[in-house]
Amino acid sequence: NSVPKYLDMIEYTIVVVNNGPDKSFNVTVGDLLPDGVKFISSTGQYNPDTGVWFVGDLDANESATLKIVVQVIRVGNITNNVNVTGTGHDSNLTNNNDSVSVNVPESVLLNITKVANSTIIVAGENVGYTVTVTNYGPSVATNVVLKDIFNSKELLNLQYSLNGVDWLDYDEAINLGNINAGADVTVYFRAKVNGSVRGDVLNTVNITTSVDDARGNFSDNETVNVIANTTLVVIKDAEIKELNPGDTVHFIVTVIAGGSSDSLNVNLNDILDAKLLDVAGATYAVNGVNKGSWTGSIDLGNMLTGTAVTVDIWAKILDTADRDIFNSVNVTSDEHPDGNNS
């Protein structure tokens, strides 16, 4: 493996040849492994602590082979030197030494985690996330870029901070620059949860680096469960409370949405008394806009917290009406299925 990466395995092959003409005795090879590799295994009588491989005697033109398997544990240039000695006259000492070098490219082991400040969040309130990017080395992680992937309809006004004090609006990506080996960077996020959101909200972060040999966990996500905190107030009044048969009664209904969250699927139900009122001829308006005939109920849809809707209902009192008119309105929503009355 002449182009190993960090933590790869290398197999060194050492061949000793007696070129003759005489027999060589007590042949010994010295190969003390360099820093940057870790001994895994070998063939032959090799001692990794001393670097000595005792070959013994070699006849003329006889050879012996040693294989050493190591693991790369650092980056950069790693050179392995070897030499051989033996008893007897050696007419050529220039070939008793050899070396081989490998160049291990820069490498990083990165990890990113994302944790929410709470796994249960109320719609309409703020959620916070803490993102930690760690470089376990061995090299510097250069040009680290962090991206937060979120649904802009669920999380509003997303901001980030590198110190928890100074906040900036998030815009597509954050350039974290270089992260040294053994160091980490913490990024804080905060956003307002849309008041109309319910259920799980998934948020994902990922990182990239310009280091070619990058490993580890480059992405993480966090899911929070969004619940509602809503109130519905309904107020009903009559414009004139003293009326006669044949007059038109004007009911005024005001619906107010409160709480931290928006009220979803608000429905107003007002059944007029057909024995006292001309139900078929009743009309209504919403926030001052005439809507036509009143059929007994209306879907107000989603109401933002802090907003109000006014519904006016007009109906003629029948000529046969002979008693007081009692009228009740009920307003329901997803969070208040039983409704509130007035």
Regions found by a protein language model. Give the residues of each.
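Exported/extracytosolic protein signature
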Residues: 1-342
